[in-house]
Amino acid sequence: MLLQIYHTNDIHADFPFLSRVHGYLREHRDAQDFYFDSGDFTDLKSVLVQADRGKGALELMKLCRPDAMALGNNEIDLGSEDLEKLTAFPFLCANAVHNDGTAIPGLKSHVILERFGKRFLVIGLAPYYSAQMIPNKYNLFFEMGNIHTTDPIPAVERILEENRGSFDFSILLSHSGHLVDRELEKRLPPVDLWLEGHSHAFVTEKRYSQSGKGERLGRITLELDEQGVRIADSVQLELPKQGSPAFDARLEMAQAAAEEILSQ
């Protein structure tokens, strides 16, 4: 049996691109297929994001029915107060807390999703290390919004250990960058699939996928049988230029609402 995982990263409020994703998924995604995003979907350069601090933008993302989304630095830039209002969306982050170390209400570290009797452990990570593996690199800025990221290594180790025997396949939605992910892999127990973001790279390997800066749609094909779950294929899809009329209609309404808010 085949199961598809669709994946985006670093869309940075490029809603015309998301319209193309929406159109493609509506046509090709089966009911059981996954869609994940690895962070930086929002961006405060966007009028739509500025107007209501990300709520309208994420309502548009909901049209694509994501199963889980990583917390990127652009989501963290919204600050704790606004981020807490968005936790109805399927954000995951195992290494972000308030400055005082308390949990961010509603923000989950991981989920276990089931498809065809197989259990998929999905973990989200926000940036902590620089590309040169300098720790604590982002917190000077993050802490201005009362969010602090922590070392992802013990966080992932803990989740893998606590869920030992409760999953068949592990997926990391990592907004850490490809070079950091390669270093993390050396220091972590095995993770089956890394869906990456942050470094805006194109990565197409069986266990790694990253789709530039909101430029392509990753598609990973899994084979499921009584022996387990295996990665069969990984590609980056160049989407048709034509977007989704249904999405575009909602986008037009959202943009009008944003302009009205900002004009007040």
Task: Report residues per predicted region.
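Acidic, metal/ion-coordinating pockets
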Residues: 1-263
